[in-house]
Regions:
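Portal/gating segments that form or line small-molecule/metal binding sites
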Residues: 1-120, 130-172
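Feature captures the catalytic ectodomains and active-site-proximal regions of enzymes
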Residues: 127
Length: 172
């Protein structure tokens, strides 16, 4: 998910993958971020550089409700952002029960890890890069329990990237 120092400069950029992965963003009602991803996103998308880099995506992100998980941030400068000091299962269930379309998490491996362990993620959208990092930050940390996934869709690209959509297999 990231190099040993948190770097993501190894990730391949591909306009086709960006287009495919951004299709669901206009139907997203809430974005969730851990503090590191929040800082990165809030430091770019509201700025003139972010708005000119991808005007449609910037408009969606800037106008949509957001939750940032952080024990250190005292206030959120990015409009429409709620800060939560910890991941509270009842609060997540309340957010999921609201009428609407989709809650999307960008990056934020620790949040994905915790929500996965609690069984609160309905779908995983992953972009597989043809890069072996060797060391670094894993998407699923040591707390994640084993889970089976059902493949919903897979798309391959000339760049070598693979876009994957999985649904956790629910026990019957």
């Amino acid at each position: 998910m990231a190099g040993s120092k948190g770097e993501i400069d190894w990730a391949i950029r591909d306009d086709e993958v960006t287009e495919l992965s951004s299709r669901g963003q206009d139907s997203t009602d809430l974005f969730m971020f851990g503090r590191i991803t929040y800082d990165m996103m809030a430091g770019f998308w509201p700025t003139p550089a972010g708005k000119s880099a991808n005007p449609t995506f910037a408009a969606i992100l800037n106008s949509t409700s957001k939750v940032a998980f952080s024990r250190t941030l005292k206030m959120a400068d990015w409009p429409n952002t709620e800060l939560l000091a910890e991941l509270n299962t009842d609060r997540i269930l309340e957010l999921k029960s609201r009428p609407g379309k989709t809650i999307m998490i960008f990056g934020s491996g620790s949040i994905v890890d915790q929500l996965s362990t609690l069984g609160l993620i309905d779908e995983y959208q992953l972009i597989l890069n043809p890069v072996v990092l060797g060391r670094g930050k894993r998407l699923f940390g040591d707390t994640a329990a084993m889970m089976n996934l059902d493949l919903m869709d897979a798309s391959t690209f000339k760049s070598g990237l693979v876009f994957l959509r999985y649904r956790p297999t629910r026990k019957k």
